[in-house]
């Protein structure tokens, strides 16, 4: 039974050596913004649709984008690194100890405004000052008179990633520019930039381009950047693979550019969480491939990762220490003195740590296929827990991708699923699960929403399945249904689809907003923004008349229902029955009760819910059919089932 799983947190102090931490993989991310500073990037784009909005330049919008992303990461991903590199500036700065370069490696016209590191409150405030303070921006955002070498920019980024994030699994370089051909007249510099881009790719850094088109010129990536940007391999699930889209500034102000950049970056900034890596998927004896598992869908909730002490001048993280103390003597108990016992027959039976481990050991982590069943045999109510998405990994066994793809396509073609024995990691409780094939899902822009792969859906235990209570619903009449259909049609969401990205969790966002204000030493917000509140004015405008018509129809149908009910009471008194008639009436009631009890027992027998009947009803039924009514409830149920089986 799923509810009977023991609490592993209570045993954590005695199983520290045995817990397999490699089963959960957290991918830290390092993002470096490379924003070009040029005359065109500093020119504010006019907004003909809004006269009140202040025009903003693409460079300012990109800096705002970096600022907002830094705000988000300081709360949601506190271990990720973010940096801002300005190139094409008149002044140069690489590190604080050397304004013009680092040792013998000069990077002219490259200004490292924010070093690649975990963002602190001072970094966020400094970047915000650059965006809002015009004097500060006029001091730094000065375009150089001579062109900057893209090879130097990429080599500078290479040095930053190598120095600050050498072991990060995800490293990305965001280039924001409106120049689609920076070295149109110099093939040597273009070739050097291509070589530096290849070096970044070999280092594991993914270059992402945010091209900005102008009203007079569309950004053409084929002139220069197609040779620099390497797309990720489709067989690598942890390598980002995004389509490059152009962001036009024509007819839009800096806020529109910012929103466009933020939506594109937010789709890339979701951290990858691997529940397990290189887990064997056993298709048969001595036939295994390796897969990795990801939890794609999960409800987010505020989680405490540590305790913070706010009593001093600065907040400090509390280091917790667990100490076990004996109740009788209050002395500290050593780890080797601890024994765990279970109560059997009124006595406590103690087990050693080795015996405890042997009891919980169900074998090595594995996904073992037991058999195959048609998808029609998997009911929708069998989904009781979060499903795990699995994808092939070549790290464990070479050729896993080909075998995995063949299995997935075959299951899709034959409309079947695999029944598997699933042990996620060491010391984990095994479960019977359904291995369901999944197709790739794309949105209207042909962007991938759900990747192709397979899903592990844990199946419920027998004790998890409950019998639904009997409900007698009143079906609404057709006129009332027709009126409600009109209301639903006018209130339908765009394209009839719910987009969770448009409705963030208000309580979670409020929690993050408070933490952000505390971390950045800002004023606490007065009110939370809740996008889940219905738009009552818009609802009334669209469906107000239809709702009133539905209410009138509801009253009409209610009157018809009340008028159709039979009269169940009268004012006339009945004469007192004679003793003979009273005896006959009692006999009639007894016969009716027995017949009603038989019908009820038969109904529960057909539904398989005899255990819902009381012992009294079961005994009366058995005695009325000359059967024994002694024994426990289970024995009575068995006799009732045997009685109906013989019929």
From Swiss-Prot:
<dbReference type="GO" id="GO:0006303">
    <property type="term" value="P:double-strand break repair via nonhomologous end joining"/>
</dbReference>
<dbReference type="InterPro" id="IPR047087">
    <property type="entry name" value="KU70_core_dom"/>
</dbReference>
<keyword id="KW-0547">Nucleotide-binding</keyword>
<comment type="subunit">
    <text>Heterodimer of Ku70 and Ku80.</text>
</comment>
<dbReference type="GO" id="GO:0003678">
    <property type="term" value="F:DNA helicase activity"/>
</dbReference>
<keyword id="KW-0234">DNA repair</keyword>
<dbReference type="InterPro" id="IPR016194">
    <property type="entry name" value="SPOC-like_C_dom_sf"/>
</dbReference>
<protein>
    <recommendedName>
        <fullName>ATP-dependent DNA helicase II subunit 1</fullName>
        <ecNumber>3.6.4.12</ecNumber>
    </recommendedName>
</protein>
<dbReference type="Pfam" id="PF02037">
    <property type="entry name" value="SAP"/>
</dbReference>
<dbReference type="InterPro" id="IPR006164">
    <property type="entry name" value="Ku70/Ku80_beta-barrel_dom"/>
</dbReference>
<keyword id="KW-0539">Nucleus</keyword>
<dbReference type="GO" id="GO:0005524">
    <property type="term" value="F:ATP binding"/>
</dbReference>
<feature type="compositionally biased region" description="Basic and acidic residues">
    <location>
        <begin position="579"/>
        <end position="598"/>
    </location>
</feature>
<feature type="compositionally biased region" description="Basic and acidic residues">
    <location>
        <begin position="1"/>
        <end position="10"/>
    </location>
</feature>
<dbReference type="Pfam" id="PF03730">
    <property type="entry name" value="Ku_C"/>
</dbReference>
<keyword id="KW-0233">DNA recombination</keyword>
<dbReference type="GO" id="GO:0042162">
    <property type="term" value="F:telomeric DNA binding"/>
</dbReference>
<keyword id="KW-0067">ATP-binding</keyword>
<dbReference type="Pfam" id="PF02735">
    <property type="entry name" value="Ku"/>
</dbReference>
<dbReference type="Pfam" id="PF03731">
    <property type="entry name" value="Ku_N"/>
</dbReference>
<dbReference type="InterPro" id="IPR005161">
    <property type="entry name" value="Ku_N"/>
</dbReference>
<keyword id="KW-0227">DNA damage</keyword>
<dbReference type="GO" id="GO:0003690">
    <property type="term" value="F:double-stranded DNA binding"/>
</dbReference>
<dbReference type="InterPro" id="IPR027388">
    <property type="entry name" value="Ku70_bridge/pillars_dom_sf"/>
</dbReference>
<dbReference type="GO" id="GO:0043564">
    <property type="term" value="C:Ku70:Ku80 complex"/>
</dbReference>
<keyword id="KW-0779">Telomere</keyword>
<feature type="region of interest" description="Disordered">
    <location>
        <begin position="569"/>
        <end position="598"/>
    </location>
</feature>
<dbReference type="GO" id="GO:0003684">
    <property type="term" value="F:damaged DNA binding"/>
</dbReference>
<dbReference type="InterPro" id="IPR006165">
    <property type="entry name" value="Ku70"/>
</dbReference>
<comment type="function">
    <text>Single-stranded DNA-dependent ATP-dependent helicase. Involved in non-homologous end joining (NHEJ) DNA double strand break repair. DNA-binding is sequence-independent but has a high affinity to nicks in double-stranded DNA and to the ends of duplex DNA. Binds to naturally occurring chromosomal ends, and therefore provides chromosomal end protection. Required also for telomere recombination to repair telomeric ends in the absence of telomerase. KU70, of the KU70/KU80 heterodimer, binds to the stem loop of TLC1, the RNA component of telomerase. Involved in telomere maintenance.</text>
</comment>
<dbReference type="GO" id="GO:0000723">
    <property type="term" value="P:telomere maintenance"/>
</dbReference>
<feature type="domain" description="Ku">
    <location>
        <begin position="282"/>
        <end position="472"/>
    </location>
</feature>
<dbReference type="InterPro" id="IPR003034">
    <property type="entry name" value="SAP_dom"/>
</dbReference>
<keyword id="KW-0378">Hydrolase</keyword>
<feature type="compositionally biased region" description="Acidic residues">
    <location>
        <begin position="11"/>
        <end position="21"/>
    </location>
</feature>
<keyword id="KW-0238">DNA-binding</keyword>
<keyword id="KW-0158">Chromosome</keyword>
<dbReference type="InterPro" id="IPR005160">
    <property type="entry name" value="Ku_C"/>
</dbReference>
<feature type="domain" description="SAP">
    <location>
        <begin position="610"/>
        <end position="644"/>
    </location>
</feature>
<dbReference type="GO" id="GO:0006310">
    <property type="term" value="P:DNA recombination"/>
</dbReference>
<feature type="region of interest" description="Disordered">
    <location>
        <begin position="1"/>
        <end position="24"/>
    </location>
</feature>
<keyword id="KW-0347">Helicase</keyword>
